[in-house]
């Protein structure tokens, strides 16, 4: 949240265009040159301005959005992990599973199961 509020207050307009592209379609971002092009900047200048505006590199920001969306979908829907992997731009479901486990600490299926167990427990407390 702090990254989101800081970004909202101080983003260079060119970086804002790239951030919107990442948030709207993280699976469509296949390389950083694409984001630099959206921002209308050279790759080197884009990296410099992006990091100065957000505090992180474009790749780190993309990965943060991918984790955020993966967690949201894993806990709030029954979308298959293969479909989620495609939506987020991973070349294979195995790559997505490794990425998720490395960033979240559990496999997507284990995370979904535990989060749903928590939701059932919350319901029982009411």
Residue ranges and their predicted role:
Residues 36, 45-48:
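Short acidic/polar alpha-helix capping motifs at helix-coil junctions
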Residues 1, 45, 94:
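N-terminal/domain-start segments enriched in small and hydrophobic, helix-friendly residues
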């Amino acid at each position: 949240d702090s990254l989101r509020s800081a970004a909202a207050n101080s983003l260079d307009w060119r970086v804002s265009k790239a951030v919107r592209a990442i948030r709207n379609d993280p699976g469509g971002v296949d390389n950083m040159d694409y984001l630099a092009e959206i921002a209308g900047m050279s790759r080197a200048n884009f990296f410099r301005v992006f990091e100065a505006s957000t505090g992180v590199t474009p790749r780190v920001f993309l990965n943060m959005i991918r984790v955020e969306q993966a967690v949201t979908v894993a806990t709030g829907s029954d979308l298959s992990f293969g479909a989620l992997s495609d939506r987020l731009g991973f070349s294979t479901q195995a790559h997505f599973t490794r990425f998720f486990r490395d960033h979240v600490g559990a496999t997507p299926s284990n995370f979904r199961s535990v989060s749903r167990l928590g939701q059932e427990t919350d319901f029982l407390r009411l």
